[in-house]
UniProtKB/Swiss-Prot annotation:
Gene Ontology CC annotations of this record: extracellular region
Pfam families assigned: Crust_neurohorm
Tissue: Expressed by the venom gland.
Gene3D superfamilies: Crustacean CHH/MIH/GIH neurohormone
Reported function: May increase the toxicity of alpha-latrotoxin and/or other venom components. Is non-toxic to mice and to the cockroach Periplaneta americana.
Main location: secreted
InterPro entries in the record: Crust_neurohorm, Crust_neurohorm_sf
Name recorded for this polypeptide: Alpha-latrotoxin associated low molecular weight protein SGV150-311
Keywords: Secreted, Signal
Subcellular location: Secreted
UniProt similarity note: Belongs to the arthropod CHH/MIH/GIH/VIH hormone family.
Signal peptide: 1-18
Length: 91
């Protein structure tokens, strides 16, 4: 495991203990492991994009929002910026 992966894992473990899942809209159906996995993805995106409130937006609605889906797509290489651009209305 390289240093970056270790730091991301460490940050996600720490964030699980710092963040109450109920605070971001999660119920009892999400396991601590899944919460940590999703949160680690948000941390990775925040580090790549350096947006000030990216982490909060990514965690929004218990990882069910648009930002989380975009983050996962970006990390997997499936993200395309043109997907976020609305098509012009037909004439």
């Amino acid at each position: 495991m390289n240093v970056l992966h270790f730091l991301i894992l460490l940050m996600s473990v720490v964030s699980v203990f710092c963040i109450n899942p109920e605070d971001i809209g999660c119920d009892d159906s999400i396991t601590p492991e899944k919460f940590a996995e999703n949160d680690a993805k948000c941390v990775q995106c925040k580090e790549q994009f350096e947006e000030t409130n990216m982490l909060e937006q990514c965690r929004e609605d218990c990882f069910k929002g648009k930002f989380f889906r975009s983050c996962v797509d970006h990390l997997s290489g499936a993200y395309d910026e043109k997907d976020d651009v609305e098509a012009p209305p037909p004439e």
